[in-house]
């Protein structure tokens, strides 16, 4: 285990976090929130000093292997979260540290679940930090590190694979550092377009900025106690469109940028993703015409917003879907689990994995009928390697294991099954709101510190595709090798 290299990269993450904290500090100064500004600046200074000291000298031995790559990813997200929670705690706005950690982990993992009943009491500076954490976590913090700290020797790809969502990470350009830069360029441009669109729709500047960060990262933290209900239907429609756009694999945008139109528009995963959105929107709208009670267009609008919000794992809400018909709630639970496309800022299992699982099931049925047949699974016009199919099955087993254990652990708090099941669905899949006592107009403060710790783990595991978090618990991970 190359501990010196792990500490070196963790320190770089601290430096980036320290610089990032200067933005909410400036925001707090502008709005004359002096206690929040002092708390934010102290954490920023500490991060920059500690980071600078630990990165002063690069380790002599830079070589590391897959297990170090996973530990680096998990460690960086833990450090980022534990330090990122301090402004909330030091300022006194969130008096319990476990709650502050829950809130910022929800931010960085782009979950959007909250323990706050009065968001506006945080003040503008901390609301900005809370929303900006969505944007930082959306594309991946270590992807950003790779743009400023290229490691070479294949180590970049090792880290990128461990952090990036989806069954496979393909390099868009030959060098991984250039891939990271290309991703962030697309991400930044789309975010700017998103914020400008919100401004043109009539949103105040601060709202457009924070909602833009949440939409781009597919996060979902509301900045008002009323959620998204205060904004016009046109603004809500634009939010839906951009949530869906950020839920598409960024490789598609890279292909569009390179004018490879045929490859971009023939993406099987993107077409399936959009088809799921269309079918789910129509079903929920017609299934809830009576419950919504304001006509078909009203039902279509709010169904479209909710479907876009849930499948992309953003978690914004305009209506309380706790009051919708049960079949619609079942569709919402399915969307929570399926998630967006691989290589997007969205969470969940990912549409590409569902496609592979369904095709693998079809292959097995075909082989039962035709035992001598040779049938390969294809995705995006390419024949999939056996290891990719196997990794999807392994991921699903790990996913179900963590899911069941988590529901069991939080059940000791005594809440009903729907609340517990949807709470884990919401946190593990990085959604935000659940059903029943953790629905769109409720929050997660009802749970004990232990259950919050379980959900903190789930949010991190969901964002990091499970294995980087699980590997921390293996004794073999920490054994020294010669």
Language-model segments: which ranges?
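Membrane-proximal intracellular helices of multi-pass ion channels
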Residues: 1-482
């Amino acid at each position: 285990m190359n501990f010196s290299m792990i500490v070196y990269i963790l320190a770089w993450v601290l430096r980036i976090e320290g610089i990032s904290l200067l933005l909410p500090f400036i925001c707090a100064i502008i709005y004359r929130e002096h206690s929040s500004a002092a708390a934010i600046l102290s954490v920023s200074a500490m991060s920059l000093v500690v980071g600078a000291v630990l990165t002063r000298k690069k380790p002599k031995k830079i070589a590391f292997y897959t297990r170090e790559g996973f530990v680096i990813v998990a460690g960086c997200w833990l450090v980022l979260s534990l330090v990122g929670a301090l402004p909330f705690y030091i300022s006194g706005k969130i008096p319990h540290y476990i709650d502050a950690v829950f809130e910022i982990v929800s931010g960085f993992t782009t979950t959007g679940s909250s323990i706050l009943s009065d968001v506006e009491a945080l003040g503008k500076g901390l609301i900005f930090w809370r929303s900006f954490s969505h944007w930082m976590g959306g594309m991946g913090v270590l992807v950003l590190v790779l743009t400023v700290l290229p490691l070479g020797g294949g180590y970049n790809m090792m880290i990128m694979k461990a952090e990036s969502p989806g069954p496979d990470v393909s390099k868009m350009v030959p060098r991984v550092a250039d891939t990271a830069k290309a991703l962030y360029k697309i991400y930044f441009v789309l975010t700017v377009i998103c914020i400008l669109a919100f401004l043109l729709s009539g949103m105040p500047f601060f709202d457009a900025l924070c909602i833009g960060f949440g939409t781009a990262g597919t996060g979902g933290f509301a900045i008002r106690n009323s959620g998204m209900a205060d904004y016009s239907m046109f603004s809500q429609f634009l939010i839906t469109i951009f949530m869906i756009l950020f839920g598409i694999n960024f490789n598609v945008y890279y292909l569009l940028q390179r004018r490879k139109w045929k490859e971009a528009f023939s993406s099987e995963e993107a077409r399936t993703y959009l088809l799921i959105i269309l079918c789910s929107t129509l079903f929920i709208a017609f299934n809830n015409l009576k419950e919504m009670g304001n006509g078909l267009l009203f039902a279509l609008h709010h169904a479209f917003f909710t479907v876009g919000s849930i499948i992309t794992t953003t978690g914004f809400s305009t209506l309380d879907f706790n009051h919708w018909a049960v079949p619609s709630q079942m569709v919402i639970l399915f969307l929570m689990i399926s998630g967006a496309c691989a290589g997007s800022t969205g969470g969940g299992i990912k549409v590409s994995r569902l496609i592979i699982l369904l095709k693998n099931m079809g292959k097995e049925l075909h082989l039962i009928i035709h035992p001598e047949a040779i049938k390969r699974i294809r995705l995006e016009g390419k024949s999939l390697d056996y290891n990719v199919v196997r990794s999807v099955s392994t991921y699903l087993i790990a996913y179900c294991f963590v899911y069941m254990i988590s529901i069991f652990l939080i059940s000791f708090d005594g809440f009903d099954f729907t609340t517990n099941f949807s709470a884990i669905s919401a946190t593990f899949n990085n959604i935000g709101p659940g059903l029943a006592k953790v629905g769109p107009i409720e929050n997660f403060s009802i749970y004990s510190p232990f259950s919050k710790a379980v959900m903190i783990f789930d949010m991190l595991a969901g964002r990091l595709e499970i294995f980087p978090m699980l590997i921390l618990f293996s004794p073999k991970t920490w054994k020294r090798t010669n």
